[in-house]
Amino acid sequence: MQNIPDIKQGPISVDAIYEIMGAAMNIPSVAKGQPTQFVVLNQIEALSKASEIVPVPPFTMQALAAIVVCGDKDKAQEKDKWMFDCEAASQQILMTAHANGLGSYISAIYPHHDRIEGMTELLDLPGNVVPHSYVSLGYPAHVPGARDAFSNERVHYNGWVRRKSTF
């Protein structure tokens, strides 16, 4: 799975959005209390305004939907752990979009104060809800080949040792 560099026009089905949302909502919660909240943007005007707040590559301007992943600090039973749930939900969105034939691109909102403030105002979020990430969705014009970032040098067993496992 990787970011898709070109998105073609075409509406994203409600069923695909619901499947993506279902996967994102079913993550294990580190913060407990399921503090993740989601704002689906599917109107051109809202997408355009959001792209002025969160830097996105030009190709994402063709996306016909985006999901803003937010954390509700009041629902997080463990303070400041809401962001971990948002990160896991964002990853689920990327993976489920890919499984549904969609391309996706993720942009960080949190911890950038200007982006948080701008998105909070645009979406009229209550004070306890913090926007975390912005995921653009669209059908890929072409799918690049799979990328393999595996490196044995990044794997350590039983401590910071650079050697293969004895398994």
What are these regions (language model features)?
Residues 1-167:
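Acidic, surface-exposed loops and disordered segments
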